Amino acid sequence: VKLLIALDVVERRPDSPPLRDALRRMLSASDDDVANELWDADGGPEIVTRTARRLALPAARPPEIVGRWGDTMLGIADVVATYRHVLEKAPAAWRDLILDALAAAPRHGSDGFDQYFGIPGVLPRPWAVKQGWSESPRDVVLHTSGLVGDGWRFVVVVLASFPVGTDWATAAAAVNDEVTALAPGL
């Protein structure tokens, strides 16, 4: 979802240098405070609707609860199309900012969560990743997605949800197993 928020900013406010540092923090350290500010300032669910229409993301749906941007529904094809858009259609300066931020993802997100599961936990660099994690009354979610290989040759996406009560270590191990299974083809 944070990639959709970033792409919406690029489309609607392309000449906004102060947003560059904020977007960099939101994407690399998965900073929820920045995402919350941009979500509220730019129309919340309309961000998903606008960006999904512009990028032709067939499964993208805004969250049922307006303020829970992390509950936005995206299919794997939507995530792949989003990365392709960044690579092929985003303005060069913004593309570089987005890719540099994703490639600089620190081990721990701004909330202290260990982001090195899935792609960064299993695959060697180069990679540029956007990790996702959340708990809700319905499930525990852990996603890893990104670009890997020289020249960002491959898009890798693993979207995983687990029963309520699943601990993060168990979820991360399962996501790591999925990426490990994909690794020989990369």
Where are these predicted regions, by residue range?
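Short, flexible active-site-adjacent loop segments at beta-strand->alpha-helix junctions, enriched
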Residues: 1, 32, 151
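Active-site SXXK
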Residues: 1-15, 26, 156
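Acidic/polar active-site rim loop that often engages polyanionic ligands
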Residues: 6, 28-32, 79
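Short, well-structured active-site flanking segments
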Residues: 11-25, 30, 42-45, 94
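Alpha-helix C-capping/helix-to-loop hinge sites
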Residues: 29, 33, 86-89
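Penicillin-recognizing serine hydrolase domain
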Residues: 40-186
